[in-house]
Design a protein with these regions (language model features):
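Soluble non-transmembrane domains of integral membrane proteins
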Residues: 1-132
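Membrane-interface amphipathic helices and adjacent TM-edge segments
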Residues: 101, 173-185
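Aromatic side chains
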Residues: 63-64, 162, 178
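Interfacial loop/helix-cap signal at membrane boundaries in integral membrane proteins
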Residues: 111-162
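Generic amphipathic alpha-helical segments used as scaffolds and interaction surfaces in large
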Residues: 95, 138-142, 182
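Alpha-helical membrane-inserting segments
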Residues: 152-155, 172, 176
Length: 185
């Protein structure tokens, strides 16, 4: 019997770990429609395990993500642990059984990418990975910060300068709220 298996290893905690509430660095996964983010120090104290039907897992830092996407429609066990090295892995719960002169193929996708919205969205779309955009942490106010990011990015592409993009974004926000501000006086 054979089991599908994948593992990511990180030797040590990054030296420039910010440990700042705005940006998550550490273990990240989206398993059965649940986003799970675990810090390095939490995993050093206690390992994390979850059985899931679908999803992805990885280790991310400020600018990069390394992720595994297990075979679809198969139950797998995800584990984040620390034994002299940080490990994020999965193993299928059901074995692959082969008879003589038979073969089987399973695809495990590995993605090592920059945390750029266009790159991550490209992988999510081309490889049909649900909620892969969550590797980029927009914070708990993502419903505000993500559209603001796209607006500033649009102005940057239009104007070629982030300073001008921020000024243009500020003008648009001020214009949107002008009637409300004018009404209060």
């Amino acid at each position: 019997d054979f089991y599908s298996y994948g593992q990511i290893i990180r030797n040590k905690i990054p030296r420039d770990l910010t440990d700042f509430y705005i940006n998550h660095e550490g273990f990240v996964s989206h398993l059965d429609d649940e986003l799970i983010e675990e810090d390095y120090d939490d995993i050093q104290e206690k390992k994390f395990t979850k059985i899931a039907q679908k999803g992805w897992l990885g280790i991310g830092d400020k600018y990069w993500i390394t992720s595994l996407i297990p075979p679809s429609n198969k139950e797998f066990k995800t584990t984040f642990d620390y034994k002299k090295k940080f490990r994020a892995n999965f193993i299928a719960t059901e074995p692959l059984t082969l008879n003589e002169k038979s073969s089987v193929e399973e695809i495990v996708q590995v993605i090592v990418a920059a945390k750029r919205v266009d790159v991550i969205d490209g992988y999510a779309q081309s490889l049909d990975i649900d909620n892969f955009d969550l590797v980029i942490d927009f914070g708990f106010l993502y419903f505000i910060t993500k559209p603001l990011f796209f607006a500033i990015d649009y102005f940057f592409k239009l104007l070629g300068n982030y300073g001008l993009a921020i000024i243009a974004m500020t003008i648009c926000i001020r214009l949107a709220f002008f009637p409300l501000a004018n009404f209060s006086f």
